[in-house]
Amino acid sequence: LQGVDRIIATPHFYAHRERSVERFLERRRKCCESLMLKGPLITNILLGAEIAVEKDISDLDNIERLAIQGTKLILFELPYKAFSDWMIEEIENISSEHKLIPIIAHVHRYLPYYTKDDYEKVLKADAIFQVNAEAFGNFREFRFVKKLIKNEFPLVLGSDAHNVTDRKPDYDLIMKKSDRKIIENSNEILEKSKRVI
């Protein structure tokens, strides 16, 4: 309907709440199977996780299994608080040890918490940056995203849809406010990640 040709389901993973990666993966599998039974058949759905960055998360056994299925991509959510160097260090430790490509989720949402210097550190990370459709409808966030585009940072687009009511997908907003090239670049990054496995 909105030009979407792939779904990447990334339920939140909070290490301090989970007993193990395996338990999380089992719950995720059951939820996905249940969802598929209730709705129309979705043929292009990939499972992953949105990993909350916590201290020492890089020491967690089997964390590499949270990468997006069929890719070397792994999605991280930074804490919504003042920036500290350990946050990027944890991401880099995981990606380096397991040869994964990190994606920093909804990079525009940290604007209220991070200074310009903090953002410089985040954007220096060897990572891909994910931007949600909502950023294209918020003046401050959209201005930030335009700078990322202008400076040719690697971006992937997302909806962060949780439902079809108050957290529904809104890709039409991206289509209205941006160049088609952004969408093509995002798709190319996702396609390339499948080829490097």
Where do the model's predicted regions map?
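Hydrophobic residues within beta-strands of alpha/beta enzymes
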Residues: 7-8, 129, 157
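Short acidic/polar active-site loop segments enriched in Thr and Asp
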Residues: 5-6, 100, 155
